[in-house]
């Protein structure tokens, strides 16, 4: 299974003055596999330490931060020497050993030859709680579920994935129906590695759904096991409400849907816990679609999405036939799935997302982002509906923007906006860069 992040890891490896690297990501998005795959492919040796299960290694760090003694102790435990320049050191579930966190500072300052990558399932929570975290001494990379492009490669469609990335619209046109079929399949499978692997090997939708439900159970167990006891009920309320929140015409998150009289301040900790775990994405409203978007952020209004479109489908129990054949059940929920998909693709591609709505609610844009000096208003259409009323409002009132509608239709450039195929939406910034006048 090819992951795009492997290329970024290789860049990190070859960077002069690199720092220890921390990979962030939700449980079961493939962090451990990625680190081991990177180590076995690009290093002559790797050392894997899981602080959740390796009590000896944990004790070595807890006894003091003399790095030479720690390395010596690890070598004794492993029964082999650790060659700093040719070995990848992997610290997994590092949140279980705060002293290992702290040691990263000293590795960066004193033992610069060592290649160190760390990760953990609840790393975001630990980062908020750990006051001795080595600020400025580490680098971060975020790992998300497989993108649609990675999914295509995993199911044996590498050439098709490459064609999509080329943005050769003429050559892509004959493969539109095939791409739409794979896209709808991705709506069901999602990007969780175990689900993708099972589908790639067996094409068994039922077994994929079993895996997704198992992942959901693991997340719910994490709520009880790792979150503060008093916050757990509120975490569950937010988590369970997300499909219904996304099914609304106006997808702004409404706390009143959780329970009567619910207030935002009562749920702040629960919301942040879910974000820190990488389980949700919180997208703020902007009051104006103008540069810089951050300056117009309205923190009181936001939308909440899940980490994965397949997990969203599993939560509402959408069956594969509904999605692939487009029956009434899918028709009712397709807008939510499509928005969830677009959000994943754009965030995985490195974009910071917002949404926009007019003060009186007369118009709303699903997403808005900026690329260099360009503001991109984005209206999402689940099928081939070419109406884009809200996009038209923005285009007329903010002429310096680059309006885009994304849908199942083919690429087309119109006088006031661009229709961009859903299957290629992760390459939207690339396309705009190509269109930008060269100085």
Model-derived segments and their meaning:
Residues 1-16:
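Pre-Walker A adenine-sensing motif
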Residues 23:
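Hydrophobic anchor at the beta1->P-loop junction of P-loop NTPases
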Residues 31:
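Conserved lysine of the Walker
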Residues 34, 38:
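Hydrophobic positions on the alpha1 helix immediately C-terminal to the Walker A/P-loop
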Residues 53-84:
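Short glycine-rich substrate-engagement loop in P-loop NTPases that contacts/grips substrate
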Residues 90, 115-121, 142:
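Structural recognition of the conserved hydrophobic beta-strand(s) that form the central parallel beta-sheet
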Residues 127-247:
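Interdomain motor-coupling "hinge/lid" segment immediately C-terminal to the ATP-binding subdomain
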Residues 197-364, 368-370:
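Accessory nucleic acid-recognition modules appended to NTPase machines
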């Amino acid at each position: 299974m090819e992951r795009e992040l492997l290329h970024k890891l290789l860049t990190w490896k070859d960077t002069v003055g690199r720092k220890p690297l921390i990979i962030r990501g939700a449980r079961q998005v493939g962090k451990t596999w990625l680190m081991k795959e990177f180590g076995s492919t690009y290093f002559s040796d790797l050392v894997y330490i899981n602080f959740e299960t390796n009590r000896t290694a944990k004790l070595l760090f807890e006894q003091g931060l003399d790095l030479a003694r720690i390395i010596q102790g690890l070598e004794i435990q492993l029964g082999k020497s650790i060659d700093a320049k040719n070995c990848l050191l992997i610290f997994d579930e590092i949140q279980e050993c705060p002293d290992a966190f702290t040691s990263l500072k000293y590795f960066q300052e004193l033992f610069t030859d060592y290649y160190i990558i760390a990760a953990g399932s609840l790393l975001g929570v630990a980062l908020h709680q750990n006051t001795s975290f080595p600020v400025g001494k580490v680098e971060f990379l975020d790992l998300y579920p497989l993108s649609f492009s990675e999914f295509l490669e995993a199911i044996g469609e590498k050439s098709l994935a490459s064609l999509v990335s080329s943005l050769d619209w003429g050559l892509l046109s004959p493969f539109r129906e095939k791409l739409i079929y794979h896209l709808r399949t991705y709506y069901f499978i999602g990007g969780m590695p175990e689900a993708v692997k099972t589908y790639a090997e067996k094409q068994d939708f039922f077994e994929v759904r079993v895996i997704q439900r198992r992942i959901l159970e693991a997340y719910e167990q994490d709520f009880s096991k790792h979150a503060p006891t008093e916050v757990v009920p509120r975490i569950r309320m937010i988590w369970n409400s997300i499909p219904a929140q996304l099914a609304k015409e106006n997808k702004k998150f409404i706390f009143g849907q959780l329970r009567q009289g619910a207030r935002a301040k009562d749920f702040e900790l629960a919301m942040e816990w879910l974000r820190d775990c990488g389980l949700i994405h919180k997208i703020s409203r902007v009051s104006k679609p103008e540069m810089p978007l951050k300056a117009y952020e309205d923190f009181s209004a936001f939308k909440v999405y899940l980490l994965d479109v397949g997990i969203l489908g599993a939560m509402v129990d959408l069956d594969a036939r509904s999605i692939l054949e487009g029956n009434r059940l899918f028709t009712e929920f397709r807008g939510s799935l499509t928005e969830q998909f677009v959000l994943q693709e754009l965030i995985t591609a490195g974009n910071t997302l917002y949404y926009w709505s007019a003060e009186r609610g007369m118009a709303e844009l699903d997403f808005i982002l900026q690329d260099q000096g360009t503001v991109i208003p984005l209206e999402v259409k689940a099928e081939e509906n070419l109406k884009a009323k809200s996009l038209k409002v923005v285009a007329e009132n903010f002429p310096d923007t680059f309006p885009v509608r994304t849908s199942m239709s083919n690429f087309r450039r119109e006088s006031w906006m661009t229709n961009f195929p859903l299957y290629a939406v992760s390459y939207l910034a690339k396309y705009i860069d190509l269109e930008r006048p060269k100085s």
